[in-house]
């Protein structure tokens, strides 16, 4: 079972541990917070890679951010990081820009009314 646990020192310090069966499996740091949009970085422990950890953890992050009234996630991924590009596409992200250094993708969490 995958879960995320807030480890920030305050409600605005958006850092999370990723736990798999109560064992540390990685971390997520939310940055570039510009409501209603945010960006994040995710790192999965080497021994936990290719086991679906990020695929299970990111929707949990998105639910947490929706509770905080965020509506859009934006990520920048190195073009050679094909695993992350595939993961984010599978989660519904759309490519919005690309240059030699990064592919920028975004996901709308809540449709504006």
Language model feature labels by segment:
Residues 44, 50-64, 82-90:
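Conserved acetyl-CoA-binding loop-helix of GNAT-fold acetyltransferases
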Residues 18, 69-88:
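Short cationic/low-complexity microdomains
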Residues 53, 70, 93:
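Short phosphate-binding/catalytic loops that engage adenosine nucleotides
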Residues 41, 45, 78:
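Residue-level recognition of the GNAT/N-acetyltransferase active site
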Residues 36, 65-77, 101:
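Conserved GNAT acetyl-CoA-binding A-motif
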Residues 6-7, 32, 76-77, 89-108:
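Conserved catalytic-core motifs of GNAT/GCN5-like acyltransferases
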């Amino acid at each position: 079972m995958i879960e995320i646990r807030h480890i920030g020192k305050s409600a605005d310090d958006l850092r999370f541990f990723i736990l798999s069966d109560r064992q540390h499996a990685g971390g997520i740091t939310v940055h570039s917070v510009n409501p209603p949009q945010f960006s994040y970085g995710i790192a999965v422990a080497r021994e936990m890679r290719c086991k679906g950890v990020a695929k299970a953890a990111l929707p949990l992050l998105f639910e947490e951010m929706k509770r905080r009234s965020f509506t859009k996630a934006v990520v920048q991924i190195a073009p050679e990081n094909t695993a992350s590009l595939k993961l984010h596409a599978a989660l519904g992200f759309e490519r919005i820009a690309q240059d030699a250094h990064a592919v920028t993708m975004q996901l709308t969490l809540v449709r504006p009314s």
